[in-house]
C-alpha cells in the first residue's frame, strides 16, 4: 500500500490553479483571488477612510448615524453580506451583476466598517495640540484634519491596516459560496474530479494563501520602515 503525499495532481492542474481557464475562458484561481483582493483593498481603504472621518465628525447628525451603520455591519457575518449583495445588487440595479463584483462589493463594505474603526482610533490617538496648532495658523478644521492630523494618524494605522487587509485576502475564499472561481473554488473542483488527493490539493492552496499574505505583510513592513525613516529625517 502506497503511503505519503502525491502532488502529481497539483502539477497536472497547476495552470488551472494559477489562472483558471484564461485565456480561452474566464480568469480563475490565484489570478482571480488577487483580482478580488486588490480591488476590494482599494475600495475598502477609501471607504474606511471616509467612514472613519465621519465617525469623528463634530456634527452628531453625521457621527451617530455613521457609527450605527458601522456597528450594524460589523455585527453581521461576512457570509451573510455576500449573500445579500448576491441577491440584492441585481434587484437594485435592474440588471445582472457578475458574481465577482457582488463579492467585491460585500468585501469592500464589510472591511470598510472595520477600517473605519482603525481610522477613528488613529485620529483620536493624535494629540489635540496638533489640531489646535494647525487652526492657529489659519487653517480651517477640515484642512487641519486632512493635511496635519490624518497624515500622522495613517503612519500609526499601518500595522492595523495590514492585519485587516491580510484577513480580507483570506476572506476572498468565501467567494466560492456564490460560484466565483477563485482559488478555493478551483481547488474544490479539482478535488471533486479526482476524489483521492484532498490533502495534497488543500495543502497546496494553504501554501499559496500563506505566500500571498506573507508577501503583502513584507511589503507593508518595508513601507512602514520607509515612512519611519523619512519621519526621523
What are these language model-derived features?
Residues 1-233:
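Transmembrane alpha-helices and adjacent helix-loop boundaries
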Amino acid at each position: 500500500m502506497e503511503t505519503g503525499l502525491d502532488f502529481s495532481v497539483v502539477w497536472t492542474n497547476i495552470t488551472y490553479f494559477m489562472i483558471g481557464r484564461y485565456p480561452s475562458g474566464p480568469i480563475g484561481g490565484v489570478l482571480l483571488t488577487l483580482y478580488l483582493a486588490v480591488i476590494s483593498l482599494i475600495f475598502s481603504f477609501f471607504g474606511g477612510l471616509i467612514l472613519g472621518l465621519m465617525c469623528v465628525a463634530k456634527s452628531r447628525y453625521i457621527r451617530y448615524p455613521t457609527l450605527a451603520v458601522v456597528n450594524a455591519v460589523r455585527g453581521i457575518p461576512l457570509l451573510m453580506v455576500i449573500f445579500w449583495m448576491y441577491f440584492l445588487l441585481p434587484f437594485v440595479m435592474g440588471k445582472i451583476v457578475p458574481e465577482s463584483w457582488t463579492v467585491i462589493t460585500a468585501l469592500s463594505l464589510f472591511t470598510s466598517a472595520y477600517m473605519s474603526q482603525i481610522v477613528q482610533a488613529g485620529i483620536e490617538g493624535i494629540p489635540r495640540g496638533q489640531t489646535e496648532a494647525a487652526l492657529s495658523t489659519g487653517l480651517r478644521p477640515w484642512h487641519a484634519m486632512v493635511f496635519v492630523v490624518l497624515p500622522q494618524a495613517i503612519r500609526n494605522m499601518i500595522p492595523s491596516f495590514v492585519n485587516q487587509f491580510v484577513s480580507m485576502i483570506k476572506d476572498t475564499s468565501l467567494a466560492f459560496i456564490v460560484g466565483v472561481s477563485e482559488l478555493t473554488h478551483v481547488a474544490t473542483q479539482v478535488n471533486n474530479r479526482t476524489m483521492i488527493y484532498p490533502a495534497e490539493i488543500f495543502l497546496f492552496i494553504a501554501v499559496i494563501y500563506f505566500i500571498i499574505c506573507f508577501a503583502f505583510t513584507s511589503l507593508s513592513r518595508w513601507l512602514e520602515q520607509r515612512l519611519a525613516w523619512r519621519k526621523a529625517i
